[in-house]
Amino acid sequence: MKRNLLLLLMVFATLSFPLFANGTDEKNVDAANPYKGKDLVVATWGWSAGNLKKLSEDFEKKYGCNIVIDETSGNSDRLNKLIAQKNNPEIDVAILSDNFASIGIEKGLFDKIDKSVVTSYDDLYDFAKNADGYGPCYSLVRYGILYNADAVSAPTSYMDLFNGNYDGLISLPDMASTAGPYLLVSLAEDLGGSQENVTPAMELLKKEKSKIADFYMSGSSVQTGFTTGEIAVAVFMDMNVPLLRKSGLDIKWVTPKEGSFSAAATANVVKGCQNPKLAQLFIQYLISENVQNKVADVLSEAPCNSKATMSEEKAKYLASGEDAFKALKVFDLDYINSNKATWIEQFQKEIAN
């Protein structure tokens, strides 16, 4: 009897061992992957949400987490949301154009990059690195002139838009948008002014505002304007060329003689966020060579990692390589941001209304 009982206990112990072992292994797996089941909230433009989610699929698989997209549309709306949530942020990673990101940095909204985690940082082009150690640029689009070759002839400069050939068919960025202040300074320089003296440009826009069909805040209004024929020329982003061509329009890109200017997308870790380490890992993922090789195809934006490549087809309309980046018009973002509110107020009073 005792012998049978002993054998039974030995069998039970043998059968039970794998169960306990498996439980221990599962615990170890969870400990090794503390991000499993976590939601990483990434705030970006609504129009880019699907593409960013697609670009993030491998990150979700690697860490067992879920990328939740906060589709707060415009840069200004996203920045205001971050400011409102400063003491209790719901967002982990903030995607903003570089000029809006600089405002966020000034307001203390972001953590600095941990280069022991963001190990691809040194592979970025210099322009993509933040001098103070905050979030880098991971992609870039250019603003220049897009025109419908079936409707109008090619302009060569921003000033050409007011020569009478495009009356009523022009779309320009609103002053509260990313590109509005850049265009204002460019026009001021054409007219003998500067960023410190934008009066000539304000006077030009006030005089010629009847020729302008739309001052846009979102890219969707420009896309709609082209497809409906309400506009035929716009100061707009290069990334929209293939999309508009797919709609059957003969859209062409012009680099104005004043130069095209960039809007670089930055990724920052929100200070006090729920998942700071995972947010750092996500930024590393975004700027890694492997993911940067996909940026042009998935986002229709230029990658910022110097080791990244893109197809010849994409390089026809996206900035490609160091020479192309160096050719972009550069602005003093600190000066523009400190004067932007005044410019917006004047623009709304004298031009937009």
Question: How would you name each of these model-derived features?
Answer:
Residues 1-40, 352-353:
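Short, low-complexity disordered leader/linker segments with a strong preference
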Residues 27-102:
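Early extracytoplasmic/lumenal segment of secretory-pathway proteins
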Residues 45-53, 90-230:
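Extracytoplasmic ligand-binding site segments that recognize negatively charged/polar headgroups
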Residues 100-103, 227, 233-250:
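A ligand-binding cleft/hinge motif common to bilobed small-molecule-binding domains
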Residues 140-141, 203-208, 247-271, 307:
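Periplasmic-binding protein-like
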Residues 144-151, 186-190, 263-275, 286, ...:
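A bilobed periplasmic-binding-protein/Venus flytrap-type ligand-binding module shared by bacterial periplasmic
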Residues 270-328:
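Mature extracytoplasmic/periplasmic domains
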Residues 326-353:
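Conserved C-terminal helix/tail region of periplasmic/extracytoplasmic solute-binding proteins
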